[in-house]
């Protein structure tokens, strides 16, 4: 099928394939990084952590009330100032920057 395409189109398709594979690798690394940060936060705080605001390095763990239970989220420097979307903040635990850096790939 590809043999009927022009060399330019074949080259473009190869580039797209490489970019797609690179993007998949980045997404996979981002997932791994999040899991590493969740584990670090759980070890440091003793809380089960399974939410993070984005792919940026977290600076704190914000614990908030949802009805009768508590939940938590890792927040980065950008989102820490936008905590208005979290209602009923119960506690904020700062994370040591050196610790976060040591758990960053």
Predicted feature descriptions by range:
Residues 2-105:
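Acidic/histidine-enriched, beta-strand-rich ligand/metal-binding domains
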């Amino acid at each position: 099928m590809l043999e009927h395409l022009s060399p330019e189109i074949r080259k473009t398709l190869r580039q797209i394939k490489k970019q797609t594979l690179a993007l998949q690798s980045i997404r996979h690394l981002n997932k791994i990084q999040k899991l590493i940060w969740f584990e670090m936060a759980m070890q440091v705080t003793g809380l089960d952590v399974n939410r993070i605001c984005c792919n940026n390095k977290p600076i704190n763990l914000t614990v908030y009330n949802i009805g009768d239970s508590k939940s938590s989220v890792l927040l980065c420097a950008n989102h820490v100032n936008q905590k208005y979307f979290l209602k009923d903040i119960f506690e904020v635990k700062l994370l040591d920057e050196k610790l976060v850096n040591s758990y960053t790939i």
